[in-house]
Amino acid sequence: VITRGALLERTGLPRPYATSRPLRIAALELAPPGPQEMLVRVLAAGLCHSDLSVIDGSRPRPMPMVLGHEAAGTVEHVGADVGGFAPGDLVVFAFVPSCGACLPCAEGRPALCEPGAA
């Protein structure tokens, strides 16, 4: 699956970002969705303050990184183990990286991931 995203390759570029242009729209290849995943065609996405804190380096993250973690779109594919959704459904979502190892992740609450939320 080929898509496009706002790609950040390095942090700490000077402001104003309209001049230093830390982001570029890049073609990205995604692995096919697994049995517990969905593929969503993003129709609208936003960049917010948490994304700016990644750009300026105050919230360290592995690079390169695609920014924007709040979006709305249309479900294109639903994995075999996903219930309650069908292709064509309109959805909104917030993505927060999760480590899979901290207490909230172990309790099935990855949106509260301690390293991901830091």
Q: PLM features: residue spans?
A:
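Short structural boundary motif marking the start of a folded domain
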Residues: 1-6
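Short polar catalytic/cofactor-binding loops
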Residues: 8-14, 45
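Acidic Ser/Thr/Pro-rich low-complexity disordered segments
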Residues: 12-20, 118
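Glycine-rich beta-strand-centered segment in the early N-terminal region that forms part
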Residues: 30-45, 55-106, 111
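Conserved Rossmann-like nucleotide-cofactor binding loop
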Residues: 48
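Short cysteine/histidine-rich zinc-coordinating motifs and their immediately flanking basic loops
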Residues: 111-118
